From Swiss-Prot:
Protein name, entry field: Nuclear pore complex protein Nup155
Quaternary structure and partners: Interacts with GLE1. Able to form a heterotrimer with GLE1 and NUP42 in vitro. Forms a complex with NUP35, NUP93, NUP205 and lamin B.
Protein species of origin: Rattus norvegicus (Rat)
Species classification: Eukaryota, Metazoa, Chordata, Craniata, Vertebrata
Entry superkingdom: Eukaryota
Gene Ontology terms describing biological process: atrial cardiac muscle cell action potential; miRNA processing; mRNA export from nucleus; nuclear envelope organization; protein import into nucleus; protein localization to nuclear inner membrane; protein localization to nucleus; RNA export from nucleus
Amino acid sequence: MPSMLGSMMVASTSAPSLQEALENAGRLIDRQLQEDRMYPDLSELLMVSAPNSPTVSGMSDMDYPLQGPGLLSVPSLPEISTIRRVPLRLSWLNSLDTCSVTAMMGVFPPISRAWLTIDSDIFMWNYEDGGDLAYFDGLSETILAVGLVKPKAGIFQPHVRHLLVLATPVDIVILGLSYANVQTGSGILNDSVCGGLQLLPDPLYSLPTDNTYLLTITSTDNGRIFLAGKDGCLYEVAYQAEAGWFSQRCRKINHSKSSLSFLVPSLLQFTFSEDDPIVQIEIDNSRNILYTRSEKGVIQVYDLGHDGQGMSRVASVSQNAIVCAAGNIARTIDRSVFKPIVQIAVIENSESLDCQLLAVTHAGVRLYFSTCPFRQPLARPNTLTLVHVRLPPGFSASSTVEKPSKVHKALYSKGILLMTASENEDNDILWCVNHDTFPFQKPMMETQMTTRVDGHSWALSAIDELKVDKIITPLNKDHIPITDSPVVVQQHMLPPKKFVLLSAQGSLMFHKLRPVDQLRHLLVSNVGGDGEEIERFFKLHQEDQACATCLILACSTAACDREVSAWATRAFFRYGGEAQMRFPATLPTPSNVGPILGSPMYSSSPVPTGSPYPNPSSLGTPSHGAQPPTMSTPMSAVGNPAMQAASLSGLTGPEIVYSGKHNGICIYFSRIMGNIWDASLVVERVFKSSNREITAIESSVPIQLLESVLQELKGLQEFLDRNSQFSGGPLGNPNTTAKVQQRLLGVMRPENGNTQQMQQELQRKFHEAQLSEKISLQAIQQLVRKSYQALALWKLLCEHQFTVIVGELQKEFQEQLKITTFKDLVIREKEVTGALIASLINCYIRDNAAVDGISLHLQDTCPLLYSTDDAVCSKANELLQRSRQVQSKSERERMLRESLKEYQKISNQVDLPSVCAQYRQVRFYEGVVELSLTAAEKKDPQGLGLHFYKHGEPEEDVVGLQTFQERLNSYKCITDTLQELVNQSKAAPQSPSVPKKPGPPVLSSDPNMLSNEEAGHHFEQMLKLAQRSKDELFSIALYNWLIQADLADKLLQIASPFLEPHLVRMAKVDQNRVRYMDLLWRYYEKNRSFSSAARVLSKLADMHSTEISLQQRLEYIARAILSAKSSTAISSIAADGEFLHELEEKMEVARIQLQIQETLQRQYSHHSSVQDAISQLDSELMDITKLYGEFADPFKLAECKLAIIHCAGYSDPILVHTLWQDIIEKELSDSVTLSSSDRMHALSLKLVLLGKIYAGTPRFFPLDFIVQFLEQQVCTLNWDVGFVIQTMNEIGVPLPRLLEVYDQLFKSRDPFWNRVKSPLHLLDCIHVLLTRYVENPSLVLNCERRRFTNLCLDAVCGYLVELQSMSSSVAVQAITGNFKSLQAKLERLH
């Protein structure tokens, strides 16, 4: 079943202004998204340009800006929030109080478990609630180290999800961990949520320690296990499924010494150096680098290789070297704060490309290291270089904060530093330092907070957080940063980071609050959306960023957030500012302007002295620059009288600055859509099936992410819809206008007392800004609505068989999908969405499922993409497709007619060619005609297309041209169908052939192919139906198609009032006039309008055209004469008689023209000039003068010249003689190579041909001259004596006249005969002539025979007298005898 594609979807009818608004809003989002992606790398925040250019920070007040005197302070802005406390079991506490036990405590975040070892036993429990206890007591030795490992793939049974590695002084034991009630391969991050933890009782592996005390165990993501030895060595436990020839199932490798160390007992491994135990191992899984820290502060770097399977030590730096380097960087700082190092932490490439390692000292100093050159993300580690020293709070000159000290635990995670410092023996202080509030600010600015923790901290760990995968596709891969976006950019979709702290009192779980969590805290604390602290929050983060954060709460649809949402909405409008005009800084900004003009993003002047706040241009959360281009629209004052008036007061070159509300909406929307906005819609994935590769097209975005984005978009859309009713326009605040104007008036101090003009100008500027923002917000609102519906459609497609739906699309749409982004889908690709919806519905139809349900769902989900008309279209399509499966002919016709009625309702919007193609397949040709005509009528209800056509198709009538073209496109569906039927009716039937193999006959590849007879029948029926149309423009289109299809006979059978005017018009204006005039005379002749037919034929003959040959022109004239005669026979109009006479004269001249052309073709066709002349003779009919002067005379066509003067009645004896002489000489010249008899025959034929034409007009047939010239030629050429007489006899010259001519020639005594020595030649000719008479007297009429006989006798007597007077000779005697014999015969006839 072919796909309906676009026929399923209504064509776009959106106004251009709406499309332009979407484009403008899209550009705003593009720029905001670009700004969000331009966050600095950690090395940029630390102002480190290269590894050899180290820097120091933490000594300036602005490094920790919220803590200095006179700086912005938000006391109620917490950094962390306690979730819960879970105490330890009382029995364990009692055990821990015993001094003789060996105990350790830690956290396994991947399985949400805390663990505790007491001597040889290990306990694990869920730190969330203290439940789900598991323990292992199968060891006899004290546990020294514990590690959790995600096993290598393919080694263990699927139910073994993790490995628990326990090290004792004697051996290393590896246990399996599984979970109850969890299906294998569920892929859940925290499996323990779904079932209890189970420790497998029997160890999977056990190997001896060789008397090596192991202090810590760590693993890589790919399952490698590393152990730190008290002897200062780094070990690895290598394990595999089965033992090999040269390898054990499980073995221990010492990477600090020989690679064969597992073969040598530790007792034999002597060392001359003092042991420096390794106390910490950290692994950078993002780069495959391993770091170790020893008890004495030595840091070593190991490269695990690109694939994580290698092992090589590349660098080792002692604590003294680190302290020396730090001292050289921070020269004014006491070096004691740089040691000892209590913790090292990996900085993954998702946070920084240039900094790889962080070390924290006991004084809270952070030391940043790099292992390779900057800006080379793929480089392998080759060094360990200190690049930055970050001092903790308290080191600035004016700081009153107590410095950290006695730090014994530290945790660094994504820019957040947590440190526990010993306040006393019973309590710790927890420090939280981070730059989440200032992620874009350079140099790095951080906030800090301290809180007291009960008990001594044993472990501090970050809980594995939910991470949204970046959607990286071929279209956006060059725009997506490698590092992760700051928290402020992702806070709408990621929960706050969770941490757990373990102490002897139990587990403390807490969140690191995001800016949105801090705002929620302020709103709840202040019980409303206003208050000084909330206002400070907006100033701290700047209006636009604060508004974006505020929208997360305001747009929340959660029931528990209902009250907070209302408070956030109030804060959004109260502190979100207003659109303004920004003027050049010709006047200082007074302190009473407030956050609107004094906003750091827009202020052109510094903050006034004495302000309680720092210059916010160095405080803003994104702070992408002083003037973000996305949020201001420059407006020139040139050429605008009002602005020129303002320039008198110094207000030159203002530009619109949108409010924080407007910008916040843009920011929030860009962050919701940011992960998919410029991503490809689809990606190609290759699957293997039955040993072959299959390429499938899949959605680039998983459905879970779509659901998340849709939820956020829905909240934003509802917020915009809910708050667009304010009188100030969408999201406007009517109460702020007066205040803003007052503030503006407070800023400007006009001179010369022109206060009123200034007030008016400022008011106008303000309203301009408000209007501009209103228009922009309306566009954004449309973009949000369109985005929601487009993504909802995409989700719906993903919920179905996406690959199948896309596979049903035409190849061009599939290729277009690959290069289409989600932004394009939202803003531009109406055709793509239409095709996808059509494919979806076709899948339902193909599966014999009703489309009503999915159609209603589409209308509810995406009405902008699938309207009521689309639903009608879908219903019609369903009826059409169902009709294919119906066996009953009457039922099928009913369904087809019903589908036609549905399609006709929206005929101007359906994909007409596609629907008609399907109607053709089911042979519903009536539907093709009626639907196409209905569509044409609906597309042009006012008949503008016909008006355009009848008025000569003027170029300036753009609307007329458009409607005209739309109508023709509709008609084309009918004519294309007619053409298809014509082709099938003329197709040659398949000839029988011998089967290629035995068996039943193979069916034709196209069962829908019509037979010749069927096609012809359907054609006739469809043509009759088309002829009934009253649509004049369609009739014209049908006529034109019939002409192009060479079906003129069918055309002339049409009885329509539109045909004659169309043919007349086309005969005048169309380039193919000949064809239309030819049809026109045939139309007139068929309708017995003979006079009109004759006149059209005459025009055809006269037309200057290379399309008509001269022969055709003669045929046209001949037909015209016949039609004219028929007309005169019917009516006796004098004009018709005169016209007939003109035609006959025209025919006579035309024949001469044809004679000239044929003569040129026959004699001179190889000359190029002659070819031109022949073509010219074809191009038009010419008059006599032109034919003579330009053709007959230049080319010396004597026969043609004779015909011309004969036609013209021009008599010039000399010219006539010359022409006859030329004719005879030309004929003799042409036959010079022939024999005498052939030459005589050829000349005779020519003379007889011409003689019969001209013999009746003696002026043009000078017999005397012709006979004399011919006889001279006969005598010269020694031809037969009777040649001329025989020729003249064939011409029909009477013997008496011929005798008269010869007699006069003889008597003229022409000396020519003596010169050629044939004085008796004429007498011989006369003898032949008379002999013919004697032998056949019937050559002379009976009534004239006696007189002619007497005349002959008299003539013979005279000839004998002449002969007697001649000197005697044999010839004379012979001729004398001949005449005497002839005389006797004549006397007998007398």
